């Protein structure tokens, strides 16, 4: 049985003091959650948030990382740094990284391999744009991104990878793929993983949906057979909203 994973990506929100306040509010509201709960604050908040979540059921994620351990890469953060401050999950290839910072499939793949080699679980984001969807290219785009991201990932490591299907047209727009549509794409992603790693492994990989996930639509999404959780954006910035999603 795959344990659902619900992660809150705070993006570029919350100063360290605001982050601590948010997590303090969240802890009692999610303590009985059946799903795995992950918060993903900005880098500067990670240390403070990690102190607050010690001894709770909340795990720590980071929004990105570089693939090298150290070096002359101004502005970058390495997997070693993240490990030392208690990070367990790293979002890789978010559409905003691809769109604003020129991240390519090749860069995403390097980051995935580096994260795994340092014992971090990547949350690998894939998803199509509105125009790609209109042109009927959803499956082509998403499955290509999935294959590229997983190049070189071993049969042992694939179970430590989480995939997040985030249609770009649904992020922050209030538009959501229907639960049925999302499940179809996620099922195709799982079948692609099965073609690379076998069905047994593919059935262990958790695949989330992301894109305007809210308390109002989470139960419908989670009722689908292949959706194993959610990567939540805006709704994760309000403790009560995120708790409702976690406790769907």
From Swiss-Prot:
It catalyses: D-glyceraldehyde 3-phosphate = dihydroxyacetone phosphate. GO terms for molecular function: triose-phosphate isomerase activity. The keyword Nucleotide-binding does not apply. It is found in: Cytoplasm. PROSITE patterns: TIM_1, TIM_2. Its main location: cytoplasm. The keyword Nuclease does not apply. Substrate binds at residues 9-11, 172, 212, 233-234. Pathway: Carbohydrate biosynthesis; gluconeogenesis; Carbohydrate degradation; glycolysis; D-glyceraldehyde 3-phosphate from glycerone phosphate: step 1/1. Its EC number is 5.3.1.1. Involved in the gluconeogenesis. Catalyzes stereospecifically the conversion of dihydroxyacetone phosphate (DHAP) to D-glyceraldehyde-3-phosphate (G3P). Homodimer. This is Triosephosphate isomerase. The gene is tpiA.
């Amino acid at each position: 049985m795959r344990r659902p994973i619900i992660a809150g990506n705070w993006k570029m929100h919350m100063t360290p003091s605001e982050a601590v306040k948010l997590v303090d509010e969240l802890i009692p509201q999610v303590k009985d959650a059946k799903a795995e709960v992950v918060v993903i604050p900005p880098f500067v908040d990670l240390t403070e948030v990690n102190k607050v979540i010690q001894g709770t059921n909340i795990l720590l994620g980071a929004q990105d990382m570089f693939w090298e351990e150290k070096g002359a890469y101004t502005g970058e953060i390495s997997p070693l740094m993240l490990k030392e401050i208690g990070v367990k999950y790293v979002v890789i290839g978010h559409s905003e990284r691809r769109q604003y910072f020129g991240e390519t499939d090749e860069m995403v793949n390097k980051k995935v391999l580096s994260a795994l080699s340092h014992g971090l679980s990547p949350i690998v984001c894939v998803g199509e744009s509105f125009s790609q969807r209109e042109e009927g290219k959803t499956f082509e785009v998403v499955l290509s991104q999935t294959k590229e991201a997983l190049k070189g990932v071993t049969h042992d490591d694939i179970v430590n990878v989480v995939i997040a299907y985030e249609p770009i047209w649904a992020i922050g727009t209030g538009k959501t793929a229907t639960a049925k549509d999302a499940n179809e794409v996620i099922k195709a992603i799982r079948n692609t993983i099965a073609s690379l790693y076998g069905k047994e492994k593919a059935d262990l990989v958790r695949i989330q949906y992301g894109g305007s996930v809210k308390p109002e639509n989470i139960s419908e999404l989670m009722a689908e057979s292949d959706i194993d959780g959610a990567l939540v954006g805006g709704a994760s910035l309000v403790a009560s909203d995120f708790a409702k999603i976690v406790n769907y």
